[in-house]
Amino acid sequence: PYNGIDGKLYVLLTVTAENTEWSAKATDAEGNALDWATATASTGEGYINLSFTRNTQKQPRSGILVVTPTAEGLNELRIPITQTAAPDHLTTLDGDLDLTTLGLDHGYSTLMPYAPDDTMIPVSTWDINILTDGVTPSMGGIEGSGHRLHFMPVTERIEMNDDDMYILPDGEYEIVTPKPHPEDPDAIYYKDAWTIDKGTEGTTTWNKYVDFWYLEYRDNEVVGAAPVVSGTVTVTKMEGFENSYVFEFDLLDDIGNRLTGT
């Protein structure tokens, strides 16, 4: 299978027919059209384009690809098709997500370490939240309704500039599995620059969404969520603006849904 730009999976099947026209369809055992698979026949070119939506359920599903010749005396060809169950996952998305359509347009960040005299850690970690209107941070977490992206890029150690500001460097940041802590308890733990730890599930209610997550809120409650497990974030500082950036996202959640946009 290959991934299409519409988020579907595609398989091309070659058909060699002699002295007959033919058609194709994807059905269940009772002959009803499937809602998750579609067969498109290109009889002149001799192939079937079988497209699937991604299975987000924990059960496999099956159907039949029916190829029907028009010539008399020829039987239809019935090919079983099966789609495996989705792997164990945390995402609630059932397809790709275009982040550009959500209205993410402002945010806030904190920097660690932020004390100029804290020189033990050779990298800087930026705790970034990008939000839509209607979502606001509070002492208890997030209030309102809307969308949020939370992620923590790591850079080489950043010092305050002449304008008393810290500037996030331009470049591409890769989503990675968190580094293990050193066995030596006296060793200093720090992450690699130009990385962002992937999203994982925390062990407490107040810290359930750790590191890189897309979250949807309704009336202060999370109603949709997706951990980002791979991909890249490209950062570009906006010229002429004191503290504004463009973020380009090319991400995957834990069942392969794409989260993309700028």
Question: What residue spans do the PLM features occupy?
Answer:
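Short, exposed coil/turn segments at beta-strand boundaries within extracellular/luminal domains
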Residues: 69-78, 257-259
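A short beta-strand micro-motif common to beta-rich folds, especially ectodomain repeats
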Residues: 59-71
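Beta-sheet-dominated interaction scaffolds and their linkers
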Residues: 1-13
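Surface-exposed binding patches on compact interaction domains or structured appendages
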Residues: 10-49
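Interdomain boundary/hinge segments at the C-termini of tandem beta-sandwich modules
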Residues: 80-87
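Surface-exposed helix/loop patches within compact recognition domains
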Residues: 112-235
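Short, surface-exposed loop/turn segments at beta-strand-coil junctions that are enriched for proline
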Residues: 53-59
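Extracellular/surface recognition and adhesion modules
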Residues: 13-15, 37, 65, 81, ...
